[in-house]
């Protein structure tokens, strides 16, 4: 097995000062901007009381501790796939053991993608709305839209230049959070007693809101403090476990100090209903302008992190056959830097709709959190299987741990569902549409693979040999290349044989069959060459990690160069005139695009799935583009795909 390129992960896996700074800039944008709206959402329109604020602070403290620190930082970060994290990386680790786990992986991935639509609007809106302190008539929506549109427009150029400033800016942001919070805690350290979980218990069981609802429903607002926890796991490959864990100590302290500082400020208004945002309320008047600027920059960085995470999520889904083929661009040579135009447009349209539909950040709070809550639950399910089967931890310990988190996350989900008619419907519908696309694509792919007919390639060697030497047939190409999905190297799809011999006899000097195996390791790039029939049939098996772009044209040329240098096969043209010049000859790829034939008897569900599959395939990019093939050397052939052939029938001839 030969290696195409270095397959090691190039992330910042070691603990370094640079790695810590990069972690601040890449990972903590979402969870780091939560203080902009969490305490505001908890206080809501309720009369301020110690039961409400201390109970809310207690819930925030224990949510961050249990969900973010213990579940993600301590436990889930250990479930890395060769240094990579995220829900699809976790699924790739266990998919061979239980393929059915693809369902929670798809649901969780779709929900996380939907969360990427709501994060930029609520983060940027919360920051920009600080301007209302100076003038309540300032139109914030145009400002928010301008920032979001500009953010999405620069994606195609990459984020290398501005990315260098993300870490320092987020360091300033967290330092500001801690300083502002500490300024309010001075002389009000009594609020720290909220660390006692009894305050949280009393809020959830005894408190009644202004709407005569149980305090339990405030969990929907509390959950906003941990919505960025999944990013710690998703961006594991960029920063490394040591850098994330150490930097989290600083981030968690800054967040908690700010939350408790806001709580102390709010309690100064005991007996009243507060107006405005307590985040800006704890700022000295002279600092508000600077605070708004820093908050806006932090919100932009949070949005950028979510956008980049969405690109990575889709690129992984593409390799795992969970998403229609879309064009992926690489604006820089830096590993992990990618740009997906269709997803960029989808997210931009979604963000603009959210801003125009909801208007204010307070109205968006109802839509925020529900989707990522679903991702949390799906990650818990996958994590349980990983701990049991891969790590072989005792069933009792895993059962108790997962039961605790299922209770916590289901409680959050129930509370978040209460916000369905206040914006939650948007994220549920968005998640549902994205999950539907993934499920249709995956289901159709399974149907196609299950019903694809394979034949023994050795049975056709004599015919291939004769065709290659038959000078009465015009030579189609010197080298003819087919992509095959046959895992067994002794087999080939019957459609390939149909293309070579029946559709139009294709004479060539050498027939190549390329097979791509997407492996669980993220950055593997290896290949194996098998000479099936000397000087006539060669098969190449590529083993590519699920994060590797399928640049088959480039990879194939690399293999050819290696084989020529090793003198494994004679590639010089068999045309006499070209052979004198030592010319290798031409290469032509044949891509077979299957279409649904009329000769089928599909079930209702299969017909539904295949109809949607071909619709999605029609609006996605072609197979040749997806595999990075040079269109000038590609022939696309349409071949019928007979699914569930109709039963035999009798046709009577009359005279």
Swiss-Prot record:
One of its GO terms (cellular component) is plasma membrane. It is a multi-pass membrane protein. GO terms for molecular function: potassium ion transmembrane transporter activity; symporter activity. The chain crosses the membrane at residues 19-39, 42-62, 102-122, 132-152, 161-181, 214-234, 246-266, 282-302, 338-358, 370-390, 395-415, 420-440. Pfam families: K_trans (PF02705), K_trans_C (PF22776). It is found in: Cell inner membrane. The keyword Phosphoprotein does not apply. Disulfide bonds: none annotated. It catalyses: K(+)(in) + H(+)(in) = K(+)(out) + H(+)(out). It comes from the Bacteria. Its main location: membrane. Keywords: Cell inner membrane, Cell membrane, Ion transport, Membrane, Potassium, Potassium transport, Symport, Transmembrane, Transmembrane helix, Transport. PANTHER family: K+ POTASSIUM TRANSPORTER, OSMOTIC STRESS POTASSIUM TRANSPORTER. Belongs to the HAK/KUP transporter (TC 2.A.72) family. Transport of potassium into the cell. Likely operates as a K(+):H(+) symporter. This is Probable potassium transport system protein Kup.
